[in-house]
Amino acid sequence: MSFDPTGYTLAHEHLHIDLSGFKNNVDCRLDQYAFICQEMNDLMTRGVRNVIEMTNRYMGRNAQFMLDVMRETGINVVACTGYYQDAFFPEHVVTRSVQELAQEMVDEIEQGIDGTELKAGIIAEIGTSEGKITPLEEKVFIAAALAHNQTGRPISTHTSFSTMGLEQLALLQAHGVDLSRVTVGHCDLKDNLDNILKMIDLGAYVQFDTIGKNSYYPDEKRIAMLHALRDRGLLNCVMLSMDITRRSHLKANGGYGYDYLLTTFIPQLRQSGFSQADVDVMLRETPSQFFQ
């Protein structure tokens, strides 16, 4: 796994993902290599050196695509291993044991993904449904805990609309995971400050990683929650990203692009009173501590 701690890190992104079959929408097939390489080049000029790629098994992950993007642009892509959430699980999540699922993750961390030299650097994005953890999701979380305990690689989760984060942490902790090795995803999709503070108090990291998705939750409210965390001295527990998943998100297709975080959101954050040092904590220092 290549990781440059001197640069910025986008903590939760997708470079190649295909949920078009599940959603019956070709826009959900993100696979346009030339457009994505151009955007990675743009990110490099803005100081980004690492992209944490959250596409796991059966989400349309493409290891060779990631390797090619790295070679062409010079950006580091940290790949993941795991299973997403119940609605997207393949049949064998039902039939295989927890130990077998864990071993699959371990193999992708230690040996490589799909016969390539690319090894998973993180167990992710393991998810739960909105307002509940299904039995199969619990099974995957336990498998992820086993794989983490064997390899030491960190865990990054998916919460549906900022629900079940505390329950995710309780489940992982019950199976021996040190919560300082867990980051909870999608904490920025509702008024969620109380739960965020509880998760941080337990030792976990939190992600504001749907920045720019104003139709779900406006960026000005994200900024207000970040101010509340800054006032409490907790920015060292926060990481940022955008969760690009669609063709229409790309700039070449009229979208805001991967650099919206840097070109639009960060200037808004600075204008609201954040210092450059505050920004650097969330985009460089904290990810460098967590992901290496």
What are these regions (language model features)?
Residues M1, Y260-Q292:
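Mid-to-C-terminal alpha-helical segments outside catalytic/metal-binding sites
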Residues Y8-L10, R49-N50, N76-V78, A120-I122, ...:
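Structural preference for beta-strand elements that scaffold enzyme active sites
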Residues D68-R71, N76-T151, Y205, T210-S215:
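Active-site gating/metal-coordination segments in enzymes
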Residues N149-A228, V238:
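Catalytic pocket-lining loop regions of alpha/beta-barrel enzymes
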Residues M54, D209-T210, L234-G255:
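Short acidic/histidine-rich active-site segments
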Residues L19-K23, A63, F89, G165-A170, ...:
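Histidine/acidic-residue-rich catalytic or RNA/ligand-binding cores of hydrolases
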Residues T6-A11, H16, N25-N76, Q99-L118:
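Alpha-helical scaffold segments that flank or form the walls of functional sites
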Residues H12, V51, Y83, H148, ...:
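Divalent metal-coordination and catalytic microenvironments
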